[in-house]
C-alpha cells in the first residue's frame, strides 16, 4: 500500500492510496467518492477494495480536491472532473491502461463526465443521472444559507474521521447537485455501465432518474436493484 500525491493540471494536489497485489492483473480499479465524503466512502470503498485486491486487481482510492487530505477547493463538478482525469492518467502511467471505475452517487456523475480513455467499464452505486429537487432550507442552516446569499460561499462541517475540518461549497455546488443533465453526463460514454440501486434510491428519485437516462447508455449496460453483500453491509 502506497500513499501517493497527484498534481492536477491546475496545480492542486490530490492525495490517494494505491495498492497493487503481488498477483495483480494488468487492470486496476479506480474509486470515485461522492460530494462531502472521502476516499473511504464511510468504509464502503475500503471493503470493496479488499475484495477486489483478493481477486487480483490493483486499486486506487483518492480524495477529490476539497475533500480529505487533498488540496483545498470549492466543491463543484469542473475541478473534480479534472481530478478524476488526473488520477486515471496517473494509473495509466503506472502501466494500468485498463481501468474499471467504481463510483458512488455524485462521484459516479463526476467519473462519467470525466470519461478518461483508460476506463473501460463503470460500476456505479446509486449514481445521480438526472435532476433532483432539494429543499435547501432542510439541508443547510440559516447561517449557511445567509453566507451563500451574501458571500457566495459557505462551509459544511466534515464529521468523518478525515483530517479535514470542513468542506467549502458555493451556489454552483447547489446548481450542480440539483440540475444534473443526463445528456451532458453520458455524452461520449461508449463503454458498458453496470448500475446498482437499492430501495432507498427508489424513495429519493435516483432510480427514476436512472430509468429515464438508461436509453442513453451504451449497449451492454445493466441496471440492477440490489442490496450490499452481508460482509460489506456490516462494515459499511
Where are these regions (language model features)?
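N-terminal cap/lid segment of alpha/beta-hydrolase-fold proteins
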Residues: 1-24
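Short beta-strand element of the alpha/beta-hydrolase
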Residues: 26-34
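The serine-hydrolase catalytic nucleophile loop
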Residues: 36-49, 207-208
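Conserved alpha/beta-hydrolase
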Residues: 49-69
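Catalytic nucleophile-loop/oxyanion-hole region of alpha/beta-hydrolase
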Residues: 40-41, 65-96
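The alpha/beta-hydrolase serine catalytic core
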Residues: 9, 14, 109, 118-236
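Alpha/beta-hydrolase fold nucleophile elbow
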Residues: 94-105
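Glycine-rich nucleophile elbow surrounding the catalytic serine of serine-hydrolase chemistry
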Residues: 103-113
Amino acid at each position: 500500500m502506497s500513499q501517493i500525491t497527484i498534481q492536477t493540471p491546475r496545480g492542486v494536489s490530490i492525495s490517494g492510496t494505491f495498492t497493487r497485489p503481488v498477483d495483480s492483473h494488468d487492470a486496476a480499479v479506480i474509486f470515485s467518492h461522492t460530494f462531502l465524503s472521502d476516499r473511504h466512502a464511510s468504509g464502503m470503498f475500503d471493503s470493496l477494495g479488499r475484495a477486489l485486491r483478493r481477486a487480483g486487481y490493483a486499486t486506487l482510492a483518492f480524495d477529490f480536491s476539497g475533500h480529505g487530505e487533498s488540496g483545498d477547493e470549492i466543491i463543484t463538478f469542473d475541478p473534480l472532473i479534472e481530478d478524476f482525469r488526473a488520477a486515471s492518467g496517473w494509473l495509466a502511467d503506472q502501466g494500468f491502461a485498463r481501468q474499471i471505475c467504481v463510483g458512488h452517487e455524485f462521484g459516479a456523475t463526476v467519473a462519467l463526465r470525466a470519461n478518461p480513455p483508460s476506463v473501460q467499464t463503470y460500476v456505479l452505486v446509486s449514481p445521480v443521472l438526472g435532476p433532483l429537487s432539494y429543499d435547501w432550507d432542510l439541508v443547510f442552516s440559516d447561517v449557511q444559507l445567509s453566507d451563500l446569499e451574501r458571500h457566495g460561499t459557505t462551509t459544511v462541517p466534515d464529521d468523518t474521521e478525515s483530517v479535514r475540518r470542513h468542506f467549502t461549497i458555493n451556489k454552483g455546488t447547489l446548481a450542480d447537485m440539483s440540475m444534473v443533465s443526463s445528456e451532458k453526463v453520458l455524452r461520449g460514454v461508449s463503454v458498458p455501465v453496470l448500475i446498482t440501486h437499492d430501495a432507498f434510491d427508489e424513495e429519493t428519485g435516483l432510480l427514476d432518474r436512472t430509468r429515464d437516462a438508461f436509453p442513453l447508455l451504451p449497449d451492454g449496460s445493466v441496471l440492477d436493484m440490489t442490496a450490499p453483500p452481508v460482509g460489506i453491509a456490516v462494515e459499511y
